[in-house]
UniProtKB/Swiss-Prot annotation:
Belongs to the chaperonin (HSP60) family. Its EC number is 5.6.1.7. Keywords: ATP-binding, Chaperone, Cytoplasm, Isomerase, Nucleotide-binding. The lineage of its organism: Bacteria, Pseudomonadati, Pseudomonadota, Gammaproteobacteria, Enterobacterales. GO terms for biological process: protein refolding. It comes from Serratia ficaria. This is Chaperonin GroEL. InterPro entries: Chaperonin_Cpn60_CS (IPR018370), Cpn60/GroEL (IPR001844), Cpn60/GroEL/TCP-1 (IPR002423), GroEL-like_apical_dom_sf (IPR027409), GROEL-like_equatorial_sf (IPR027413), TCP-1-like_intermed_sf (IPR027410). Forms a cylinder of 14 subunits composed of two heptameric rings stacked back-to-back. Interacts with the co-chaperonin GroES. Gene3D superfamilies: GroEL, GroEL-like equatorial domain, TCP-1-like chaperonin intermediate domain. It is found in: Cytoplasm. Together with its co-chaperonin GroES, plays an essential role in assisting protein folding. The GroEL-GroES system forms a nano-cage that allows encapsulation of the non-native substrate proteins and provides a physical environment optimized to promote and accelerate protein folding. GO terms for molecular function: ATP binding; ATP-dependent protein folding chaperone; isomerase activity. GO terms for cellular component: cytoplasm.
């Protein structure tokens, strides 16, 4: 086992604080409407330019191992805030730095670290309760656009795009961000259920100009098996031909004789058919087939539940208003499924989301909810260069997370004002002893730090503006963008409550642990082995 380097007490805390400050100082230059960019060098390709706090934090590793431990713990604050709310990473870092700095000063002055931590925790619990009271629901498009604009660093076009996307696919719909091909941002909305499987044969194409298959008011056959024998399909094909409607077959696979016969029937115009593979694999495929069945009021023909393809009737088939299939996607638009049944299915999947343990499973389940509940919107980000594209895409993703958080828990006045109001409301809070009171004061002082940092980044005097804002009430604050005082909510400067709450909770959690640190242990650097220069070769 490698030898260890151990530091105690003040020696350890000073080193740790130095690491915290390096990381926090790099991150906090990005805060607010007049925050600056940070350029990150990459081992290959062009450097990345970003104003996203967590991206900056993730890049920082320090040479001194004790300092690095401090930096890594604050990095954890930014990452946790990012995971919980998708934004607020810089705010969380600024809060953590303030609590740690003030807390360590108090420890150096002889306060009990555990009582300090209890005081900080007490203040945060009270602050979160007050935040909830200040929170205003965020339901209309205008408020959603404002939240998106603020989170995308005052880029109005991004805010409007996100609001438009949410309006079209609903609050539950899937909104994804992709790199576009032009200079302008675009919004593509896919209504209905889309899955990543295309037609099994190009001979099904009936719209050559777009290279796609379009079926109007089709029946939809859902089979959880491979179909290779045409005999199994004949009863259904005959019934559909009599009804004079097209047919979409969604099965594990359609191959051989069955596929050939379907192609021939389609080309001769006897019956209009298209076949696609079912989406997903294994158990997920069964679940997705069931989703399609719910959406189209059909039944999944599965031998597991005793249903045979040969005995399928028109009653077992689903129906939709329209189906569009191209090389690699299928879209089912306006399934005839009963609204209550669809809602029941959505509730069931939501339950699974809560119980899911892996992020991948959770993401896939959320996609399924969106496909059933709303639709899918794709925001295509336009930019002139690759570097700008990456930076802008990261901003749009941040803004999207922020708007989702706003819809979930509501909004509060932005620009650091909400935390100042909360601090004012709980100023009379008392702990069990004097050390806890100091901990409460440390937390209250930290709640001013986001506003102060926004003002510093705007090149103004932080103390003057912080005092002016404290003297006001409600959503009265300072707009660093236009350099004027006023009602933040009326000016459209909003922060999602969830983002502010997460930033405060995670900052206090990690900072509290760091204040109570008394000893740090790390590996000693290995001494370089002496090189063997001058060793003689073998005698000849």
């Amino acid at each position: 086992m490698a030898a260890k380097d151990v530091k105690f007490g003040n020696d350890a805390r000073v080193k740790m604080l130095r690491g915290v400050n390096v990381l926090a100082d790099a991150v906090k230059v990005t805060l607010g409407p007049k925050g600056r960019n940070v350029v990150l060098d990459k081992s290959f390709g062009a450097p990345t330019i970003t104003k996203d706090g967590v991206s900056v934090a993730r890049e920082i590793e320090l040479e001194d191992k004790f300092e690095n431990m401090g930096a890594q713990m604050v990095k954890e604050v930014a990452s946790k805030a990012n995971d919980a709310a998708g934004d607020g990473t810089t705010t969380a870092t600024v809060l953590a730095q303030s609590i740690i700095t003030e807390g360590l000063k108090a420890v150096a002055a002889g306060m009990n670290p555990m009582d300090l931590k209890r005081g900080i925790d007490k203040a945060v619990v009270a602050a979160v309760e007050e935040l909830k009271k200040l929170s205003v629901p965020c339901s209309d498009s205008k408020a959603i656009a404002q939240v998106g604009t603020i989170s995308a660093n005052s880029d109005e076009t991004v805010g409007k795009l996100i609001a438009e996307a949410m309006e079209k696919v609903g609050k539950e719909g899937v909104i994804t961000v992709e790199e576009g091909t032009g200079l302008q941002d675009e919004l593509d909305v896919v209504e209905g259920m889309q899955f990543d499987r295309g037609y099994l044969s190009p001979y099904f194409i009936n719209k050559p100009e777009t290279g796609s298959v379009e079926l109007e008011s089709p029946f939809i056959l859902l089979a959880d098996k491979k179909i290779s024998n045409i005999r199994e399909l004949l009863p259904v094909l005959e019934a559909v031909a009599k009804a004079g409607k097209p047919l979409l077959i969604v099965a594990e696979d359609v191959e051989g004789e069955a596929l050939a016969t379907l192609v021939v029937n389609t080309m001769r115009g006897i019956v209009k058919v298209a076949a696609v593979k079912a989406p997903g694999f294994g158990d997920r495929r069964k679940a997705m087939l069931q989703d399609i069945a719910t959406l189209t009021a059909g039944t999944v023909i599965s031998e597991e539940i005793g249903l045979e393809l040969e005995k399928a009737t028109l009653e077992d088939l689903g129906q939709a208003k329209r189906v569009v299939i191209n090389k690699d996607t299928t879209i089912i638009i306006d399934g005839v499924g009963d609204e209550a049944t669809i809602q029941g299915r959505v509730t069931q999947i939501r339950q699974q989301i809560e119980e899911a343990t892996s992020d991948y499973d959770r993401e896939k389940l959320q996609e399924r909810v969106a496909k059933l509940a709303g639709g899918v919107a794709v925001i295509k980000v336009g930019a002139a260069t690759e570097v700008e594209m990456k930076e802008k895409k990261a901003r749009v993703e941040d803004a999207l997370h922020a708007t989702r958080a706003a819809v979930e828990e509501g909004v509060v006045a932005g620009g650091g004002v909400a935390l100042i109001r909360v601090a004012g409301k709980i100023a009379g809070l008392k702990g069990d002893n004097e050390d806890q009171n100091v901990g409460i004061k440390v937390a209250l002082r930290a709640m001013e730090s986001p506003l102060r940092q926004i003002v510093i980044n705007a090149g103004e005097e932080a103390s003057v503006i912080a005092n002016n804002v404290k003297a006001g009430e409600g959503s009265y604050g300072y707009n660093a963008y236009s350099e004027e005082y006023g009602d933040m909510i009326a000016m459209g400067i909003l922060d999602p409550t969830k983002v502010t709450r997460s930033a405060l909770q995670y900052a206090a959690s990690v900072a509290g642990l760091m204040i109570t640190t008394e000893c740090m242990v790390t590996d000693l650097p290995k001494a370089d082995a002496p090189d063997l220069x001058g060793a003689g070769g073998m005698g000849g």
